[in-house]
Amino acid sequence: LTAAVEVVDKKVSASVGDGANVTGDTLTVKADNTTESVTAAAGLGAGGTVGLAGAASETFVTHTTDAHVGKNTQVSAVNGVDILAHSNFTQGATAGSVGVGGTVGAGLTNSTVSFTGDTAAYADEKAVIDGGKKVNISASQLTNVDYGTVAGAVGGTASLSGTVGVNVLKTTTKAYAAGSSQLSAKTADAEGIAVTASDETPL
């Protein structure tokens, strides 16, 4: 039996601290959390009578991305305020096994990916933001999992092969202005206020 196990706990955050007073031409608060990973396992078993082989690829990931302007802050920027949280996770997981036996051959594989992603962009309670030209609060999450399993078995009397691929994905993506916060964009050429969230998981 061959096993490959990967555990990832990755946190990225960017913020303007509680109670801060910030002025300037522009303000960008950006958290960008990007992870690419590959987990692979291969097994080979051979025996004169019985050949058994197994391979398991297990990946456990926690991805946390946070961008925010804190509580009771005062922010003023003539040409815009951007609060951006972006999470991008790509996982490749493969497992393969071959069992060869004179009488019985068996090959079994399993590939499992467990992913929890939390992405948030926000203005916290009682934050006052004058973005001048614009206020843009955006949270986006892209989760892309590609896995493969291959099993083979050769036996003079009996052969058995089996593959299992499992994805457990839990994602939460939020963009918001908390209660009692204030957002404004008032210049003559103002683009306005945008609060957007997107979550994409190709399967």
Kindly label every feature range from the protein language model.
Residues 1-203:
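Low-complexity, glycine- and small/polar-enriched segments
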